[in-house]
């Protein structure tokens, strides 16, 4: 039996027969990487942010044609986007996969808000219909009171975002939206969905999670304080979602696949509410995609506190799937968040905890991971380090290149060389693997007895365990290649390299450390952060850490957990200012606040 038989088993979703149980989740635009995922086995590809006008999407069904007599007109920008989406769709379909996106409706706008009545671009507003020309104010500028509602979340205001993420309030009070605005949103979403189907999309998904979209704001008691037929009771709060899906099913047909994205248990609704909602949706939904709320360790930054629960979403999805089955509800359940291990994916499907698994980051780390799974080579899949920098993936930097450039990176060579790689950190290890795969004879030198370089210390704080997994993977890959020789505990001197008569050498020894001009820093009781990791057990009881970025904060946490009384000193006003706010709140602030021997001090003196 194939070790990943459940991942590779087909499944019927509406009128589609998916070849595997893995999908490519939302997060990428219509770029080259999406067809590459289809090439490597993804059954459904999400294409995000389809912002073209409904009339332009519908133009494919217009007998006059796009830009033809009686047809819709396109700007150069719209034409470029139109062609890019169409090309992406054609490639996905030609490779045997299906395409899915999210229909977009007319979002109600507050008075004074950008696009709203009296606001920039809105009716009667600057640059809007019947309004004056735009002045020098930024879009949406003006007193907060003009907009009404709960404005605590602002992605451009770090303090507001920190507060919102801390309190779990990522939406707005929707009491100001008129009945007309609600129906306009529903009807325009359905119209857009019909045109997306005509355009060539095989499946549609409606996002009803996270409190930052109108559907979840109506569903949540945190945002919905209305007293009319759209608020109050659970039935009234669900009215928008239920009405929308009923109209979508009628417009798209009984077999067209529809997905709803929900949080099983979140701010403003309980787990039992989610079960009830899915039951009410009935046959109007084919797939229930479960995501976590904002207060978790996966979204939008990915380190998890424990290796035992690599996906914080799995436990509640498992419970939901089995509870739905017990009630006789046979909607397919899709789970996402943190699935970067083929064995975990297989077990999740084999145990019946989910029917589908949506993946985003893993496609960046190893675009060929499903191909390796099909070949039974799960141990060769490149592990994702969950750094949340998918566009510049550190474990797969070649992904940013176009196909032609990527193809040239690993090519068989016409002349095999004897190559030395100096440095056993991640850069040197990866270089040795690439050289070996191209056919060269490689010798890797590392002056320490252990491979990994500076990443050997990166997982000292236990929530960064993915770093250790990546180093272990690199070492396994090196040892599997017969044309790689490891020289650990060996300093690669010029004399040694000359004596061995190497054709070429790659130097991967990392940067030099920069020391701050701080009085006392050269005394015996001072040391660099890497030295502090290595001699942590011999450091005195009281330790001061100079520098409060991620490195300084993590060594402080590490030493405090070892019993030292640590004070981290920073001149930046807060710890880890360079990290995404959710990562700071969940993995840094919550973490160090639970350690009584950890503290920090901010100061303004610069040296």
Predicted regions and their residues:
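C-terminal structured "cap/appendage" subdomains that terminate the fold
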Residues: 346-358, 363, 475, 492-498, ...
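Rossmann-like dinucleotide-binding cores of NAD(P)H-dependent redox enzymes
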Residues: 444-479, 558-606
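Rossmann-like dinucleotide/flavin-binding elements
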Residues: 413-444, 487-501, 509-518, 522, ...
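Short, contiguous acidic/charged loop-to-helix segments that flank catalytic cores in large enzymes
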Residues: 303-309, 409-411, 416, 457-469, ...
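General small-molecule cofactor/ligand-binding pocket signal
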Residues: 334, 443, 485-489, 527, ...
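Short acidic loop-to-helix transition motifs that present clustered carboxylates
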Residues: 30, 340-342, 364, 491-494, ...
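N-terminal Rossmann-like NAD(P) cofactor-binding module of classical short-chain dehydrogenase/reductase
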Residues: 506
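Flavin-dependent oxidoreductase catalytic cores
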Residues: 1-422, 426, 430-442, 450, ...
């Amino acid at each position: 039996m194939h070790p990943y038989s459940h991942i590779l088993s087909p499944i019927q979703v509406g009128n589609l027969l998916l070849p595997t149980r893995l999908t490519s989740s939302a997060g990428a635009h219509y770029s080259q990487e999406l067809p590459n995922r289809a090439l490597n086995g993804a059954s459904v590809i999400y294409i995000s942010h389809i912002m073209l006008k409904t009339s332009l999407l519908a133009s494919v069904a217009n007998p006059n044609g796009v830009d033809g007599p009686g047809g819709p007109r396109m700007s150069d920008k719209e034409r470029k986007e139109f062609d890019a989406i169409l090309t992406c769709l054609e490639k996905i379909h030609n490779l045997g996969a299906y395409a899915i996106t999210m229909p977009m409706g007319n979002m109600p706008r507050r008075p004074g808000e950008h696009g709203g009545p009296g606001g920039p671009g809105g009716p009667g507003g600057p640059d809007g219909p019947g309004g004056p020309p735009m002045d020098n104010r930024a879009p949406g500028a003006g007193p907060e009171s003009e907009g009404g509602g709960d404005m605590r979340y602002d992605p451009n205001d770090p303090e507001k975002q920190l507060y919102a993420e801390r309190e779990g309030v990522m939406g707005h009070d929707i009491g100001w939206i008129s009945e007309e605005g609600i129906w306009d949103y529903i009807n325009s979403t359905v119209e857009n969905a019909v045109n997306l189907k005509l355009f060539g999309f095989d499946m549609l998904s409606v996002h009803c999670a996270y409190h930052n979209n109108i559907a979840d704001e109506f569903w949540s008691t945190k945002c919905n304080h209305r007293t009319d037929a759209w608020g109050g009771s659970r039935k009234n709060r669900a009215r928008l979602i239920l009405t929308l899906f009923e109209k979508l099913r009628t417009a798209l047909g009984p077999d067209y696949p529809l997905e709803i994205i929900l949080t099983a248990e979140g701010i403003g609704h309980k787990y039992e509410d989610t079960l009830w909602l899915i039951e009410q949706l009935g046959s109007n939904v084919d797939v229930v995609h479960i995501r976590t709320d904002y207060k978790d360790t996966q979204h939008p930054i990915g380190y998890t506190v424990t290796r035992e629960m690599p996906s914080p979403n799995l436990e509640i999805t498992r419970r939901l799937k089995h509870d739905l089955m017990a009630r006789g509800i046979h909607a397919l359940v899709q789970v996402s968040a943190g699935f970067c291990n083929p064995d975990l994916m297989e077990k999740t499907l084999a145990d019946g905890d989910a029917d589908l698994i949506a993946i985003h980051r893993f496609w960046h780390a190893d675009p060929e991971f499903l191909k390796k799974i099909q070949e039974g080579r799960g141990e060769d899949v490149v592990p994702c380090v969950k750094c949340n920098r998918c566009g510049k993936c550190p474990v797969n930097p070649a992904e940013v290149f176009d196909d032609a450039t990527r193809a040239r990176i690993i090519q068989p060579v016409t002349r095999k060389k004897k190559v030395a790689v100096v440095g056993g950190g991640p850069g040197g290890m990866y270089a040795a693997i690439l050289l070996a795969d191209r056919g060269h004879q490689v010798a890797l030198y590392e002056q320490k007895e252990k491979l990994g370089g500076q990443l050997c210390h990166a997982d000292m704080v236990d929530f960064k365990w993915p770093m250790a997994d990546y180093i272990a993977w690199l070492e396994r890959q090196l040892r599997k290649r017969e044309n790689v020789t490891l020289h650990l505990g060996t300093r690669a001197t010029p004399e040694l390299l000359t004596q061995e008569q190497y054709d070429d050498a790659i130097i991967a020894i990392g940067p030099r450390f920069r020391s701050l001009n701080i009085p006392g820093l050269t005394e015996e009781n001072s040391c660099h952060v890497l030295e502090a990791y290595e001699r942590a057990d011999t450091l005195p009881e009281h330790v001061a850490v100079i520098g409060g970025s991620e490195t300084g904060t993590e060594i402080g946490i590490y030493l405090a957990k070892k019993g030292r009384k640590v004070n981290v000193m920073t001149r930046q006003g807060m710890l880890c200012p360079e990290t995404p706010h959710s990562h700071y709140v969940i993995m840094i602030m919550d973490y160090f606040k639970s350690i009584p021997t950890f503290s920090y001090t901010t100061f303004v003196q610069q040296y």
